[in-house]
């Protein structure tokens, strides 16, 4: 029995070696692509995004999580029975490459980030915060809804730095906290707090009372 199986396996390999193009390409004969001779895969451009997603569907495995900052755009593709009617995502990175991904936790995070990054209200927030004003900005109800859908209610960032004063130095910690909230009347509140502490929580140090600009 083992000899028969090996013989059958060798026969299949021989057929695919002789008829390589039909064996490998026949399931994807409907795929149409515009490509130069032997291009790297990242330069392959498909005439239709659906064709690209359908081609890669059977080979898709979850990719390791990636930062949303690596990507410049995305496209959502609905597939048919060949992909079990799944929704796939084409993620475009800044090097001109395209990732074809199924829905996952990190992919949803990337989509959430990209779909809100170019919204007008989210671009105005840092511009307003960097300019002296009375703190009141007029926004529309639609802007408030977009802000509420994409905002992070509370975020904390820590930065360690060293203050050096001659022969003495202190290890300091800068803590940046931001809060965002959308009220029922669609008014928006956005606050930022900056605090400085010493790494070992000493009370009076260069970190909290510096005598030089860092």
UniProtKB/Swiss-Prot annotation:
Membrane in keyword set: yes
Keywords for this protein: Host-virus interaction, Membrane, Viral attachment to host cell, Viral attachment to host entry receptor, Virion, Virus entry into host cell
Domain of life, per lineage: Viruses
GO cellular component: membrane; virion membrane
GO biological process, one term: symbiont entry into host cell
UniProt cross-references to Pfam families, sorted A to Z: Gp_UL130 (PF11668)
Keyword Membrane set for record: yes
Compartments in which it is found: Virion membrane
Signal peptide region: none
Principal localisation: virion
Similarity-based family: Belongs to the HHV-5 UL130 protein family.
Subunit structure: Forms the envelope pentamer complex (PC) composed of gH, gL, UL128, UL130, and UL131A. The pentamer interacts with host NRP2.
Function description: Plays a role in viral entry into host cells. Forms a pentameric complex at the surface of the viral envelope together with gH, gL, UL130 and UL131. This complex is required for entry in epithelial, endothelial and myeloid host cells. Mechanistically, engages host receptor(s) including neurophilin 2/NRP2 to mediate infection.
Name this protein carries in UniProt: Uncharacterized protein UL130
Species name: Human cytomegalovirus (strain AD169) (HHV-5)
């Amino acid at each position: 029995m083992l000899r028969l199986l090996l013989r059958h396996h060798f026969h299949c390999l021989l057929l695919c070696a002789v008829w390589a193009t039909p064996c490998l390409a026949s399931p994807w004969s409907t795929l149409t692509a515009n490509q130069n001779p032997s291009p790297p895969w990242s330069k392959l451009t498909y005439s239709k995004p659906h064709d690209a997603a359908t081609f890669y569907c059977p080979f898709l495995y979850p990719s390791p999580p990636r930062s949303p900052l690596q990507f410049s755009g995305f496209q959502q593709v609905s597939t048919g029975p060949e992909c079990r009617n799944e929704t796939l995502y084409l993620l475009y990175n800044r090097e001109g490459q395209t990732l074809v991904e199924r829905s996952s936790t990190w992919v949803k995070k990337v989509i959430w980030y990209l779909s809100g990054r170019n919204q007008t209200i989210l671009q105005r927030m840092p511009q307003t915060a960097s300019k002296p004003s009375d703190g009141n900005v007029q926004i529309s109800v639609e802007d408030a809804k977009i802000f509420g859908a994409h905002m992070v209610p509370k975020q904390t960032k820590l930065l360690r730095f060293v203050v050096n004063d001659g022969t003495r130095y202190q290890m300091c910690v800068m803590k940046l906290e931001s809060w965002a909230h959308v009220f029922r009347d669609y008014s928006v509140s956005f606050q930022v707090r900056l605090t400085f502490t010493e790494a070992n929580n000493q009370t009076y140090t260069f970190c909290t009372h510096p005598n030089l600009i860092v």
